[in-house]
Each structure stands twice: as C-alpha cells, then as structure tokens.
C-alpha cells in the first residue's frame, strides 16, 4: 500500500494552480522555457546543419579581410577632446565647446531640432538681380509670321525664316537687310548656323531640310526622309550631326556631310515641336505635342528616359549654355530639369499662356514668349519672374497678331531677338540706367512649393 506524502495547504494550492494553468491557461501563462535549453538546441543545429559551410571560400574571405582592413584605417574620433592631457583620468570632458560648435552649457541641448531649425521652404535661395529689358529696334521686311531665328557665331548677322517662304540675313548691329535666300516652297520653321563650317541649315513645312553654302549663297545638300512638315532642327555642338524633328512624330539624325540618315528616333505619338542637342553628353532632347520630353542616347539611338510631368503639349526647349540643365515649356507651365537623367528641379510658375518659345543666356536669364504677346523674364537659378511685359502689334496688324513665335539671344547674351506674328523682328536690350535701387527685387520665399 502506497503512502501518500503529506503536503502543506500552501504547496497543494501551488500544485493545483500550476496544473490548472497547464491545462486551461493561454500561452502567456505558460512557464517560460529555460534560456540554457534554447542555446543548447541552437548550438546543436548550428553544428549539424552548417558544419560544411563553417569556413568561407578563399575569395570571399580575402574580400572581407580587405574590407576590414579599410575600416580599420579610418580615423577614429576619440570621446575626449584633443587638448586633454594623458594624465586626465576622469570621465568628464574639459572642452569648452562640444563637437558641432555648441557650448557645453548651452541651454536647450535636449530640445528637438525641429523646434530650433527653420523649415527648408523659408531658407530658399534669393534671386539674383537682373536689369529689366526694353525695346531697342523693330525690323520689318518679312511678309509672313517670323517662325525661326539663328545668330551667326561671330555675332555679326542673324538669319530669320518666315511664312513668306524666304530666309533673310540681317546685320545685327544696324538691322539692315543683307541678303534674301529663296528655295523653300512653304513656311521656314527652323534655322541653324554651323559654328565650324560656312553652312546655314533650314527646314520647313515643305518636308525639306536644306544646307546652304554661305560663300556662294546656294543650296548644296538636301536631306530627304521626313514624311511631313519639318518643324525644328538643331546642330550638335561637337559632332558633324544634324537633328531634325517634325509632324511625322520622329526625330532624325543626319550625317552633315554624307546626308545619310544615322538614326530614326521614334517613340513620340505627336508632332516633335523642338529638338536640342546636349554638348557635354552624346544626347538628344526632344519635346513633343504628346506632352512628353524624351531623352535619347545619341550613340545607340535609343530612349534614355521619358518625362511625363507636363499636362499639355510641349512647344519649346532651352538648354543652358554653361550648366548641365535644360527647361521645357507647355501651355501655362515651364519646368527645369537636370541632365543627363532628366531629374526634376523646379517650376517657373506664372506665365499663363501658350508658350511658343524659350531662350536662356549665360547670365542666367530665361525668356519665355507667349502666343498672346506676353513676355516673361526669369532668374534661372531660383525660378523668380522679375519682369513681365506685353509686345505691341505694329500699325496695320490685328490685335491677335501680337504673338511671340520664336526668340534667341545673341552670342553675348546682351540682345534678345524675337520673331512675332505681326511679321516683324524686335530686338530687345537691358536698361542701362536701371539699378537695384530703381528696380528692386520684390521677392518673398514660398512656404509650399509645388513639386511637380
């Protein structure tokens, strides 16, 4: 006969409570397993499962050794100040100024930085002061809308193409007509003067791209391939390449001398309205009426990126002459981008019109011309609009003909040339009498900047 061991009432209560918890209690009432038991199981599994990979391969071991050696060579920042002596055994620092330039006893050390620092929106870069622009000269002679302009590299003359199917050469200093070139059978939409050759390139709505020899004033080459009107062209600054774009929705890259079509840059679903070539990178930038900007790798002839931030058709592009940036314009919107990847930088807000043309000079002045005759001048760095004026249609023209069709700065950046719908060419210059006191910058930082 078994003898039941005697238990005290307290022990019986603990045993009963333990049994009840094991049977009916939730997981958080269960007895915690011993840590030693878990470590034994982990060590056993490590030994049985990872025995064959305990040693790293020689190549990986050498790579990790090099990384460890590089980390050990980095200078370590000691917790003490450099001026403390070797006999200082106490843990307290004797430095008067903490690392970071703040005094050790300064008030508010434990305050969050958000209460001390200003928001980034209120620390915007102030715009640079620019002199306002005023009308200098009005040049008449064309019988149609002036749709294209190009300045000669030596800054002695400029060319204009218009709806009267002619190209006219003007003296930049006096505005006198020097020459008229005929050959197109429709509106001349694009002009470019080669900086290395005595060539003038033109394109028009007659599907033609022509190369003019300025020594004989005759056409020496035709570039055939476009299926519809050619609206824009650009020369690569370093290579003998010509890029054209038009209503057929493609941009074509031509060898200037052999007239061969090197690439057909297809991808746009609308008219290619403007083309720019990037000097520091073999890249072509195209803007289209399908509201996209495409960045093309000129070597491969393929798309590098598509910028879809605009909501309406893009009619003009402008690359900065010295910086690695460019701008694009659509109806009521101008955006600035970074090359070569097309990272968005900022908006130029305020020009509510159909923007036909953009131009930028080396002094960081951006000009935008609208279909309704509105003109805006911007600071390229900050996007601040420092001047707005409206052009005036010439006597005998309709009010609806007060539109800016094309624009360009001369080689010095001190003269702005605009081609307008009233069949005139206007030359603008900066006001020599203006000072920061007479025309102050009325700028205030914006708290909420529109991202895209």
UniProtKB/Swiss-Prot annotation:
**Where do the segments described as Disordered lie?**
61-129, 432-452
Q: Which domain of life is it from?
A: Eukaryota
Q: Where is the composition biased (Polar residues)?
A: 114-125
PROSITE patterns linked to this entry: WD_REPEATS_1 (PS00678), WD_REPEATS_2 (PS50082), WD_REPEATS_REGION (PS50294)
Q: Which UniProt keywords apply?
A: Cytoplasm, mRNA processing, mRNA splicing, Nucleus, Repeat, Spliceosome, WD repeat
Low complexity: bias regions: 61-70
InterPro entries assigned: G-protein_beta_WD-40_rep, Prp46/PLRG1-like, WD40/YVTN_repeat-like_dom_sf, WD40_repeat_CS, WD40_repeat_dom_sf, WD40_rpt
Q: Which GO terms describe its biological process?
A: mRNA splicing, via spliceosome
Principal place where this protein is found? cytoplasm
Q: Name one Pfam family in it.
A: WD40
Report the subcellular localization.
Answer: Cytoplasm; Nucleus
GO annotations of cellular component type: catalytic step 2 spliceosome; cytoplasm; Prp19 complex
User: What are the ranges of the WD repeats?
Assistant: 141-180, 183-222, 225-264, 267-308, 310-349, 350-388, 399-438
Q: Which family is it part of?
A: Belongs to the WD repeat PRL1/PRL2 family.
Q: Subunit info?
A: Associated with the spliceosome.
Q: What does this protein do?
A: Involved in pre-mRNA splicing and required for cell cycle progression at G2/M.
Protein name, UniProt field: Pre-mRNA-splicing factor prp46
What does the organism's lineage look like at the top? Eukaryota, Fungi, Dikarya, Ascomycota, Pezizomycotina
Q: Which gene encodes it?
A: prp46
């Amino acid at each position: 006969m078994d003898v039941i061991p005697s238990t005290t009432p307290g022990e019986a209560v603990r045993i009963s409570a333990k049994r009840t918890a094991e049977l009916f209690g939730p997981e958080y009432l269960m007895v915690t397993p011993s840590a030693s038991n878990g470590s034994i199981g982990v060590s056993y599994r490590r030994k049985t499962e990872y025995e064959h990979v305990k040693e790293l391969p020689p190549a990986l071991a050498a790579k990790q050794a090099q990384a460890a050696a590089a980390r050990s060579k980095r200078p370590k920042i000691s917790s003490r100040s450099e001026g403390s002596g070797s006999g200082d055994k106490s843990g307290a620092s004797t430095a008067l100024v903490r690392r970071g330039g703040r005094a050790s006893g300064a008030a508010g050390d434990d305050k969050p930085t958000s209460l001390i620092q200003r928001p980034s929106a209120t620390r915007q870069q102030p715009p640079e002061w620019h002199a306002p622009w005023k009308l200098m000269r009005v040049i008449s002679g064309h019988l149609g809308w002036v749709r294209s302009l190009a300045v000669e590299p030596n800054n002695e003359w400029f060319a204009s193409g218009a709806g009267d199917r002619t190209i006219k050469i003007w003296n930049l200093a006096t505005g006198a007509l020097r020459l008229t070139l005929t050959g197109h059978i429709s509106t001349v939409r694009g002009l470019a003067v080669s900086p290395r050759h005595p060539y003038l390139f033109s394109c028009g709505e007659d599907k033609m791209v022509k190369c003019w020899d300025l020594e004989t004033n005759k056409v020496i080459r035709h570039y055939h391939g476009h299926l519809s009107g050619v609206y824009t062209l650009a020369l690569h600054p370093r290579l003998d390449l010509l890029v054209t774009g038009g209503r057929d929705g493609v941009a074509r890259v031509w060898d200037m001398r052999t007239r061969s079509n090197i690439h057909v840059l297809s991808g746009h679903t609308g008219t290619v309205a403007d083309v720019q070539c990037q000097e520091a990178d073999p890249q072509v930038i195209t803007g289209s009426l399908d509201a996209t900007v495409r960045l093309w790798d000129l070597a491969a002839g393929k798309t590098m990126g598509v910028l879809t931030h605009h909501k309406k058709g893009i009619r003009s592009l402008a690359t900065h002459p010295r910086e690695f940036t460019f701008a694009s314009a659509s109806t009521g919107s101008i955006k600035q981008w970074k090359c070569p990847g097309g990272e968005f930088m900022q908006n130029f807000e305020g020009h509510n019109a159909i923007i036909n043309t953009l131009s930028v000079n080396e002094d960081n002045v951006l000009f935008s011309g609208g279909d309704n005759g509105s003109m805006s001048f911007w600071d390229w760095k900050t996007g601040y609009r420092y001047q707005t004026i409206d052009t005036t249609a010439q006597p005998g023209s309709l009010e609806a003909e007060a539109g800016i069709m094309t624009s360009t700065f001369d080689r010095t950046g001190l003269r702005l040339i605009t081609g307008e719908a009233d069949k005139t060419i206007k030359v603008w210059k900066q006001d020599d009498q203006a000072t920061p006191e007479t025309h102050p910058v009325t700028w205030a930082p914006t708290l909420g900047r529109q991202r895209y």
